[in-house]
């Protein structure tokens, strides 16, 4: 069969980090790897080229598979609609994060099958059935229109599949992670045992770590053509012994790459010597979720770290000469004094890069119930659920004042914390220009949000 795998274009009105962190569609690369031997298959990344109609006309796929993030629902449905308009015989499949979290959002006249989770087995079973045109029985993880979207109800999660990165060869020079461009991504471990209250990732991947064999990891690293790799494990720094073995293998194989990873404060402070060694083995930056200056909020979020731990982690990274790309969460109960305390806290931590998002109670999270009465978004306003919009009504200041405080914080980060000089020193002037273009787009979005609230 001919299969076209599609990543939808960016949702324009969403405020996301996409301008700074633009990763390969690795889920589609995994599907490609499973199906490539028996089918003719290609990937269309609509974030780079918006050529769906041309592909439908020239490639003439029998199946179009569309991946999704939480904010993509309407975009996926509109792609499905366009596909069926052009050729109603094309089979349309939806999958991705949103399908796992909110399956029924894809129950749509133009979508034939929805993958709640993807495994080698369910991919092969479905495509065998589609090819043979035999009656479609229920398959684990797949909800088909012909079966009224029923499935076997067997619980499952996405299987770890080694992606075929050649499938995105023509796009790869575009993928970047902040100043590292081109940059590949890979996963060396699934799940997370930290179980933070606000986090979707461990709920999607599992409540404890499932580490991939390091030989398999090393083989992938050797195969990756890019000089920079972002490990998108939930907490790459979790296991000291595994990290030491990782460093051994990097040294034995003379691998010289730039690595970026997510790492928890708890892991950084529990094995500082290993963190230093990782720095010598190529670890350039760690994305750390410090979240807040408030001890109470850290406890409420069920973070396993304290404010003091945050300072310790920051010091360890600086001593190891590893950049810290910090992320924070803005609590809806903050007032202007809290924002001021927050700015002082960030100034003391002095991360090289600072990102933030307002606390977002996604419908699948327990905290959704807690904030249900203060929600500013409806569940079906899918595009609005981007991490940067205020979704909970602030309790102590007005919404427009809250947006004003966010704007003040953005200016504080850019003008006072010298992010610009870090960018130039680390990545050069052209990267600063590229990133600044993204920031410039974000600033008016917040100004617009603030003014909209004032008018209403
Ligand atoms: S450490 Fe990170 S990935 Fe793990 S549960 Fe907490 S926020 Fe989620």
For the regions a language model picked out, list residue spans one by one.
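Radical SAM enzyme core and accessory elements
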Residues: 2-5, 40, 53, 62, ...
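N-terminal [4Fe-4S]-dependent radical SAM core
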Residues: 9-12, 139, 143-188
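Glycine- and acidic-residue-enriched helix-capping/strand-helix junction motifs
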Residues: 12-28
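Glycine-rich beta-alpha loop elements in corrinoid/cobalamin-binding modules
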Residues: 32-155, 357-364
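Conserved C-terminal portion of the radical SAM core fold
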Residues: 38, 63, 91-93, 225-232, ...
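Short acidic active-site motifs
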Residues: 51-53, 102-103, 270-274, 312, ...
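Non-catalytic positions within long, well-ordered alpha-helices that form the structural scaffold/packing
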Residues: 57, 106-107, 222, 279, ...
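Radical SAM [4Fe-4S] cluster-binding motif and immediate context
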Residues: 164-325, 332, 344
């Amino acid at each position: 069969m001919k299969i076209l795998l599609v990543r939808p274009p960016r949702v324009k009105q969403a405020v996301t980090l996409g301008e700074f962190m633009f990763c390969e569609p690795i889920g589609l690369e995994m599907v490609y790897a499973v199906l490539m031997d028996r089918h003719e298959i290609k990937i269309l990344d609509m974030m780079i080229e918006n050529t769906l109609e041309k592909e439908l006309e020239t490639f003439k796929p029998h199946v179009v598979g569309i991946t999704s993030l939480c904010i993509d629902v309407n975009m996926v449905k509109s792609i499905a609609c366009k596909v069926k308009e052009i050729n109603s015989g094309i089979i349309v499949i939806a999958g991705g994060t949103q399908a796992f979290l909110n399956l029924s959002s894809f129950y749509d006249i133009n979508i034939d099958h929805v993958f709640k989770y993807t495994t080698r087995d369910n991919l092969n079973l479905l495509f065998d059935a589609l090819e043979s045109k035999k009656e479609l029985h229920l398959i684990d993880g797949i909800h088909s229109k012909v079966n009224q979207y029923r499935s076997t109800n067997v619980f499952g999660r996405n299987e770890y599949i080694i992606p075929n990165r050649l499938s995105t060869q023509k796009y790869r020079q575009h993928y970047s992670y902040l100043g590292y461009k081109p940059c590949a991504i890979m996963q060396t471990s699934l799940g997370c045992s930290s179980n933070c209250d606000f986090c979707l990732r461990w709920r999607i991947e599992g409540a404890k770590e499932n580490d991939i064999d390091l030989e398999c990891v090393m083989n992938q690293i050797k195969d990756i053509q890019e000089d920079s790799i972002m490990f998108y494990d939930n907490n790459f720094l979790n296991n000291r012994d595994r990290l030491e073995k990782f460093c051994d293998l990097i040294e034995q194989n003379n691998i010289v790459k730039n690595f970026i990873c997510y790492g928890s404060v708890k892991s950084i402070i529990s094995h500082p010597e290993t963190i230093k060694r990782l720095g010598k083995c190529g670890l350039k930056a760690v994305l750390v979720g410090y979240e807040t200056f408030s001890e109470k909020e850290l406890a409420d979020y069920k973070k396993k770290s304290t404010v003091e731990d945050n300072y310790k982690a920051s010091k360890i990274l600086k001593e190891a000469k590893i950049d810290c790309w910090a992320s924070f969460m803005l609590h809806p109960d903050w007032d202007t004094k809290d924002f001021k305390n927050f700015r002082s806290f960030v100034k003391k931590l002095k991360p090289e890069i600072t990102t933030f998002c307002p606390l977002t109670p996604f419908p699948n999270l327990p905290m959704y119930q807690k904030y249900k009465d203060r929600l500013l978004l409806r569940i079906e306003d899918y595009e609005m659920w981007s991490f940067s919009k205020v979704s909970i009504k602030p309790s102590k200041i007005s919404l427009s004042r809250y947006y004003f405080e966010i704007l003040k914080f953005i200016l504080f980060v850019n003008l006072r914390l010298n992010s610009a000089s870090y960018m130039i020193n680390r990545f050069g002037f052209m990267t600063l220009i590229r990133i600044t273009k993204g920031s410039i787009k974000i600033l008016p979005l917040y100004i617009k949000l603030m003014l909209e609230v004032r008018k209403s």
